[in-house]
């Protein structure tokens, strides 16, 4: 169990990236959803001991993460959003080097570990090729391989499927599901479908605060009967936003389709639709922004 209690972080320029964040994350896949700038990466860096929070506590089992960073690192696998690699170094040699840094000193044990990981992430056939020349999906799978060195009990993946094509994204997600059966995996993303497909529990982070949390199915069920859709002309969008709680827009066959949250039909031309996690996400962000705007005007 990863327990985060009243965690806040304020940067030197006064930006409050995290504001009183509390979460309890059990074994399995946990999705952390939020827009760019919500504070997701800051939270991931605090958990990964890459920066210290301004206040609050983080505990993983009996490890005080802030006071015992080395103890946490021994149990941690981390795939950041972006990571660099040495040029002209093969996947096998780079993974072997990273295993040394992780503390696997015996050559035979390292060889066995590296071979097993490359096969697990389906990179065995390209083990002699330089990682710098890998495609985006192959590079992310290598990133997961290095995160799995040492059999970590806590794995953090930050925006792992951004930029991947659908086939690579599906392959990568299947790998995450396999890994998440026995350890705590935190998936930080702004891609709603990843959380829908993978995670048994989730939270939404916006403006540095947790604005919703729970099981995806429970959050979706709570929205049922409250989402309505209608196709409109693009030029009508501002007028609808002024009169209704428009939570999402999308294009369908060249026309703008709006989703509106309301207890009853918001007007002619609207049809009730089955809510999805994307509706939950956008409705939550809309409510958070409206609340923030009201506070700013007060």
Question: Which residues fall in each region the model found?
Answer:
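Helix-to-loop junction immediately C-terminal to a conserved catalytic motif
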Residues: 48
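Conserved ABC ATPase "signature" region
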Residues: 96, 100-103, 108-126
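Catalytic Walker B motif of ABC-type/P-loop ATPase nucleotide-binding domains
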Residues: 155-159, 164
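ABC transporter nucleotide-binding domain
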Residues: 171-259
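Conserved structural motif at the start of ABC-family nucleotide-binding domains
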Residues: 2, 17-18, 73
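Walker A (P-loop) phosphate-binding loop of ABC-type ATPase nucleotide-binding domains
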Residues: 35-39
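Conserved ABC transporter NBD signature motif
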Residues: 56-67, 71-72
């Amino acid at each position: 169990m990863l327990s985060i209690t009243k965690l806040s972080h304020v940067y030197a320029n006064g930006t409050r990236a995290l504001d009183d964040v509390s979460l309890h994350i059990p074994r399995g896949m946990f999705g952390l959803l939020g827009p760019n700038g919500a504070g997701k990466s800051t939270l991931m860096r605090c958990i990964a001991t890459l920066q210290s929070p301004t206040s609050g506590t983080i505990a993983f089992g009996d490890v005080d993460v802030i006071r015992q960073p080395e103890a946490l690192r021994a149990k941690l696998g981390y795939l950041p959003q972006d990571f660099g690699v040495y040029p002209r170094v093969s996947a096998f040699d780079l993974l072997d080097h990273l295993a040394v840094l992780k503390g696997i000193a015996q050559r035979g044990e390292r060889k066995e570990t590296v071979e097993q990981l490359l096969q697990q992430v389906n990179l065995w056939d390209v083990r002699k090729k330089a990682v710098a020349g890998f495609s985006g999906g192959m590079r992310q799978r290598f990133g997961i391989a290095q995160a799995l060195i040492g059999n970590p009990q806590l794995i953090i993946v930050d925006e792992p499927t951004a930029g991947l094509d659908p086939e690579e994204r599906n392959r990568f997600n299947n790998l995450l599901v396999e890994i998440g059966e026995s350890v705590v995996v935190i998936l930080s993303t702004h891609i709603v479908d990843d959380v829908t497909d993978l995670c048994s529990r989730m939270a939404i982070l916006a403006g540095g605060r947790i604005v919703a949390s729970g099981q995806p199915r429970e959050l979706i069920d709570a929205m049922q009967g409250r989402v309505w859709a209608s196709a409109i002309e693009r030029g009508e969008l501002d007028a609808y936003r002024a009169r209704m709680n428009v939570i999402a827009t999308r294009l369908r066959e060249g026309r703008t389709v709006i989703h509106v949250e309301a207890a009853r039909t918001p007007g002619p031309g609207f049809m009730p639709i089955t809510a999805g996690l994307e509706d939950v996400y956008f409705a939550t962000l809309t409510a958070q922004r409206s609340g923030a705007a009201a506070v700013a005007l007060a």
